[in-house]
């Protein structure tokens, strides 16, 4: 348990930040699910549209440190590859 005022404040801040980051991670997952669903359906246009909406969100969360930048790059690369395979 935090005993000093400074430590109590850090606990409050960490709780707030953790909740906010959890919300942002959930948002990323929602965008990724939409891309995934469009790819599995085989719909190139829908997959491209969903991917184009998801990329800026993924990049923004990586910049903020919500997810690691390599994880963001991995998601983008894999989905881009899958979308290109739909067109071929």
UniProtKB/Swiss-Prot annotation:
A Gene Ontology biological process term: translation
Bias (Basic residues): 7-20
Pfam (any one): Ribosomal_S20p
One function term, GO molecular function aspect: small ribosomal subunit rRNA binding
Keywords in alphabetical order: Ribonucleoprotein, Ribosomal protein, RNA-binding, rRNA-binding
Keyword Cell membrane: no
Gene3D superfamilies xrefs: Ribosomal protein S20
Alphabetical list of PANTHER family matching this protein: 30S RIBOSOMAL PROTEIN S20 (PTHR33398), SMALL RIBOSOMAL SUBUNIT PROTEIN BS20C (PTHR33398:SF1)
NCBIfam families: S20
Protein family according to the UniProt entry: Belongs to the bacterial ribosomal protein bS20 family.
Entry protein name: Small ribosomal subunit protein bS20
Source organism of the structure: Psychrobacter sp. (strain PRwf-1)
Name of the gene this protein is made from: rpsT
């Amino acid at each position: 348990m935090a005993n000093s005022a400074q430590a109590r404040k850090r606990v409050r801040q960490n709780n707030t930040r953790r909740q906010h980051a959890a919300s942002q991670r959930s948002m990323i997952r929602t965008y990724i699910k939409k891309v995934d669903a469009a790819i599995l359906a085989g719909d190139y246009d829908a997959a491209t549209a969903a991917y184009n909406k998801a990329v800026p969100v993924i990049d923004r969360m990586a910049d903020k440190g919500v997810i690691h930048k390599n994880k963001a790059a991995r998601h983008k690369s894999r989905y881009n590859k899958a979308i290109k395979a739909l067109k071929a």
